[in-house]
């Protein structure tokens, strides 16, 4: 329920935001400050901006190894963390300045404090550039096609027998990222989607978009 409040907060103070697996759809994917999934299974846009951030506000996040890339994602020498969480245990992670409470109420209170100080982030065109790079990558991923013996999967470290064997057994030749892009185009905008294990959840965090909360 805090998604719209978070969006307005980011708009007012020019703060970009990334999404965790659990947080996807809380905010609109089309929002100009949304960078998509963050962390090990995240997007280029989210991770390149997070890498140099000097302050990270984690709203409702457990700050897991996937989200933080085992604490290696945020590489600014003086990076500080602010956590907003209704679970005290998670709020205390990353040696953060912590607020234990409701996300919507806490973000609203934080906005009032920043507004009083006349705060705005120092970003200029970094956000737009990062999003543009990722948009091109999304198009590439959606267009990957199986071309036969000369096909080169995205993942290079693999058993070379796997893809030919899969095609032989199933006659399936659509790639996972292309399939997700096709499903996104075809299903209802407000449909709920459930994924299994393996590489699918990571692809979903990267390439799945939705504006329905």
Where are these regions (language model features)?
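Active-site diphosphate/adenylate-binding microenvironment
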Residues: 135-213
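Glycine-rich, acidic loop regions that bind phosphate or pyrophosphate groups
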Residues: 23-142
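Conserved catalytic alpha/beta core of Sir2/sirtuin-type deacylases, generalized to analogous enzyme cores
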Residues: 4-13, 45, 104, 108-112, ...
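Electropositive phosphate-/nucleotide-binding environments in soluble metabolic enzymes
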Residues: 3, 40-43, 97-104, 120-124, ...
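Anionic-ligand anchoring segments at beta-strand to alpha-helix junctions in alpha/beta enzyme folds, i.e.
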Residues: 1-56, 186-213
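A short acidic, amphipathic alpha-helical/loop segment
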Residues: 2-8, 68-72, 182
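Short, functional N-terminal and low-complexity linear motifs
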Residues: 13-18, 74-80, 145-151, 197-201
């Amino acid at each position: 329920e805090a998604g719209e409040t978070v969006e307005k907060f980011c708009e007012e103070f020019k703060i970009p935001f990334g999404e965790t697996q659990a947080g996807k759809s809380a905010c609109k994917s089309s929002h100009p400050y949304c960078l998509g999934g963050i962390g090990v299974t995240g997007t280029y846009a989210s991770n390149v901006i997070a890498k140099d951030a000097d302050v990270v506000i984690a709203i409702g996040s457990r700050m897991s190894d996937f989200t933080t890339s085992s604490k290696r994602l945020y590489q600014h020498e003086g990076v500080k963390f602010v956590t907003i969480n209704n679970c005290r245990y998670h709020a205390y992670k990353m040696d953060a300045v912590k607020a234990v409470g409701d996300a919507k109420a806490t973000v609203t209170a934080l906005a009032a404090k920043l507004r009083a100080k006349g705060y705005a982030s120092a970003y200029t065109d970094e956000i737009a550039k990062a999003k543009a790079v990722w948009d091109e990558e999304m198009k590439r991923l959606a267009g990957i096609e199986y071309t036969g013996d000369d096909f080169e999967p995205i993942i290079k470290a693999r058993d070379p027998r796997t893809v030919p064997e899969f095609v032989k057994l199933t006659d399936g030749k659509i790639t996972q990222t292309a399939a997700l892009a096709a499903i996104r185009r075809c299903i209802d905008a407000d449909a709920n989607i459930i994924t299994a294990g393996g590489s699918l959840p990571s692809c979903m965090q990267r390439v799945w978009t939705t504006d329905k909360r």
